[in-house]
Regions:
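Two-metal-ion RNase H-like nuclease active-site motif
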Residues: 64-73, 174-175, 370-372
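Short beta-strand-to-loop capping motifs
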Residues: 481-487
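C-terminal, non-catalytic extensions of nucleic-acid polymerases
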Residues: 420, 455, 489-678
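Helical catalytic core of nucleic-acid polymerases
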Residues: 171, 177-186, 194-212, 329-461, ...
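Acidic catalytic cores of enzymes that act on phosphate-bearing nucleotides/polynucleotides
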Residues: 233-368
Length: 678
């Protein structure tokens, strides 16, 4: 039944989805579990790290050099490896009573206490096994017991150290794992950052290692150090910002995510102002959304939505998260020729495979295509709500107001300055913590008040444009793109000004020449200077030689396709020219997670185990594919691929240019290019 039979909305019945069958192969025999499986042994057997002398070590300490480090733990082998970020010289500590390996515990203790160390998940794991390693009388078996307790049983590391009656080490270290959203594995990060070698742990945890396997593990450990250094270098500006901003509040922010920074600073401010150390306060039951007075609509559809939100009960589940009201499920709000999804997660338009351009077929400019982003959107809505997290108390409002005002002031002085960037992190991170049940910022009514008010404000803008006869081509959580005849520029500006007066918010406009949208989250927009803005699938990733905090959030997926599309849209470069003129293999690779581990299989060749993170490119000479080792599921996009876990500095001669050209053609259609040329 259609929604519009009983009300003002409709929800067209969706086509029946046919379940897409997973392509399943029979996994090969797991030769990689055999005792004689020795990957990279020829290199590892005689390899020795270039170690620092004691004099060099003291000099490095006096210079303030930083060391990246890692540990490896097996029942009969434990090691810790350190690499000087500045010089590349190393330290290694190994223990295996079975093979007569031991180390100077006092020296390891000195290193741990006298350097700034850089690690990946060191706060949860490495620092604790190292604390046990320096305790007199411990050996590899004890460190492995600790490893099992931390990793397999989930016991907090500090508790494991206590159980072993070991001494907690006072360490100065930077844990990189929290600096990238969703905390991807080091192996995935290596793929995003064009590591020369992506290598998974070569031997199953719990294996009693042979001498040959130990040589491989130590070689592998220093490859992990190289990859950790890649992440450190990619995050250097973020770390530098945290180092400069943290002391202003007396807080160490170096290992914290953006949201964690917001919480740490609020904790510090509350302690300073009230003497309290706030703790999370749970929220149970339900609550109502408080409709802002400024939210007003003229169309019956949006008036209906407004009333539904006034009447709705927002229920907090047993897990502490807000449940979507029933009326929001599958809701699509029609305004003009567009439908919009609406809910706690945000507002999104539903366009598919559509392009817009300001010129007609004769090359005459006929339209304005203007993107309007809301400035300081959620921070302003948080302040306007008047709500505060109970754990923080009323002090939240003046603290947040001061941070907001200081940010506005500093942004005018130096938008890239420490204060401006640091306060931006605090403002944006605050909202994320309002929905976290384990945070002192937790308060579901504040989260809902912020996100729903924001969506209603955007609906007010969309409605105004629609009633004025203009077209909204796209809208998401914090902005809208409006298309109108070029002679109506003044009308559009008047609409925006009227909206700003009604809501108290401010729009930041940006004009486009054209937009090409696969959907609301994946598109390429060309601005008035013919520079491209790429989002979603088309967004650049960390393999482009300019890694930053945005680009390392995304796995590489044949980035050459997005590059070729950008060159075609902005400069008219032929697709084939873009493909064949690129000699950077990073632009052609795809990096993916392979559940449980991936293996490359090709008729007539032995299987090659790749690991849980795989990297490959389309090969004109390959008949192989990558499948998961347990269930034989095909890793998507790997048919006819060639794995390239290691770079040798040479561009492959078998790149399948036809495959990539077909991908570009497919995405031209997905981006709606043919809607411009029809």
């Amino acid at each position: 039944m259609r929604f519009d039979e009983v009300g003002l909305f409709w929800n067209d019945s969706k086509p029946i989805k046919t379940r897409k069958e997973k392509i399943v192969r029979t996994p090969p025999d797991p030769v990689w579990l055999s005792p004689d499986y020795l990957p990279f042994y020829d290199e590892a057997k005689d390899w020795e790290p270039e170690c620092m002398t004691n004099e060099e070590l003291v000099d490095a300490k006096n210079r303030g050099d930083r060391l990246v480090w890692d540990t490896e733990s097996y029942p009969n082998y434990w090691s810790a490896g350190f690499t000087n970020v500045r010089t590349g010289r190393c330290l290694i500590f190994e223990n295996s009573p079975e093979f007569g390996l031991d180390f100077d515990k006092s020296k390891l203790d000195w290193v741990l206490r006298n350097f700034t160390l850089v690690d990946f998940n060191g706060e949860s794991y490495d620092r604790h096994t190292a604390a046990i390693a320096i305790k007199p009388g411990t050996d590899a078996s004890h460190m492995y017991q600790a490893t099992q307790q931390i990793i397999e049983f989930g016991t907090p590391g500090w508790m494991v150290v206590q159980n072993f009656k070991a001494r907690k080490i006072k360490m100065d270290h930077i844990d990189l794992i929290q600096l990238t959203p969703l905390a991807p594995s080091l192996k995935i990060m290596a793929g995003r950052l064009a590591s020369s070698l992506m290598m998974d742990l070569p031997f199953k945890p719990g294996t009693y290692l042979t001498w040959e396997q130990m040589r491989i593990i130590r070689w592998y450990m220093f490859n992990d150090n190289r990859n950790t250094q890649l992440v450190y270098e990619a995050q250097f500006e973020n770390i530098k910002l945290r180092e400069e901003f943290g002391p202003k509040y007396g807080v160490d922010l170096r290992s914290k995510s953006d949201a964690q920074i917001a919480e740490a600073i609020f904790r510090a401010e509350v302690r300073k102002r009230t003497g309290r150390n706030p703790e999370p306060i749970p929220f149970t039951g339900s609550f109502k959304f408080k409709m802002p007075d400024w939210v007003q609509f003229k169309t019956p559809e949006l008036q209906w939505l407004r009333q539904q939100l006034i009447d709705a009960d927002f229920v907090v589940g047993d897990n502490g998260y807000v449940q979507e009201p029933a009326f929001c499920k599958d809701l699509q709000v029609p305004i003009g020729g567009m439908k919009y999804t609406f809910g706690i997660g945000g507002l999104h338009s539903t366009e598919k495979s559509i392009a817009h351009c300001i010129y007609n077929a004769a090359g005459e400019r006929k339209f304005i295509l203007r993107d309007h982003d809301v400035a300081s959107y959620y921070p302003w809505l948080i302040l306007n709500s008047g709500y505060y997290p109970p754990a923080i108390g009323p002090a939240f409002i003046p603290i947040f107001q001061e941070i907001f005002d200081r940010r506005q002031k500093e942004k005018k002085i130096d938008k890239k300055g420490v204060w401006a960037l640091g306060l931006k992190i605090v403002l944006n991170g605050t909202f994320g913590k309002t929905s976290d049940p384990y945070s002192v910022m937790y308060y579901p009514p504040l989260m809902v008040q912020t996100t729903i008010s924001g969506q209603l404000a955007l609906f007010m803008m969309i409605e105004r444009a629609y009633l004025a006869g203009m077209e909204v081509t796209s809208a998401n959580t914090d902005g809208v793109i409006i298309k109108c005849p070029v002679e109506r520029d003044a009308d559009l500006k008047a609409i925006v000004k009227d909206w700003e007066a009604a809501t108290g918010l401010e729009m930041e406009p940006n004009d486009y020449v054209a937009t090409f949208s696969r959907d609301v989250n994946s598109y390429i927009a060309v601005d008035s200077k013919y520079k491209a803005k790429r989002k979603g699938w088309y967004k650049e990733n960390g393999c482009n030689g300019r890694p930053d905090n945005e680009q390392i959030k995304k796995n590489p997926t044949a980035e050459i396709v997005g590059d070729a599309l950008e060159a075609f849209f902005t400069r008219g470069t032929p697709i084939g020219e873009s493909l064949r003129n690129c000699h950077d293999i990073n632009k052609f690779v795809t990096v993916k997670q392979a559940q449980g581990g991936g293996v490359f299989v090709e008729p007539g060749s032995p299987p090659i185990y790749l690991g849980k993170a795989v990297r490959f490119y389309a090969s004109a000479g390959s008949k192989g594919e990558i499948i998961t080792v347990k269930k034989g599921h095909l890793v998507g996009g790997s048919e006819g691929c060639r794995p390239i876990m290691r770079y040798d500095g040479q561009f492959p001669t078998d790149v399948d240019y036809e495959h990539y050209a077909n991908m570009v053609e497919e995405h031209l259609e997905l981006l709606g290019f043919n809607t411009l040329t029809q």
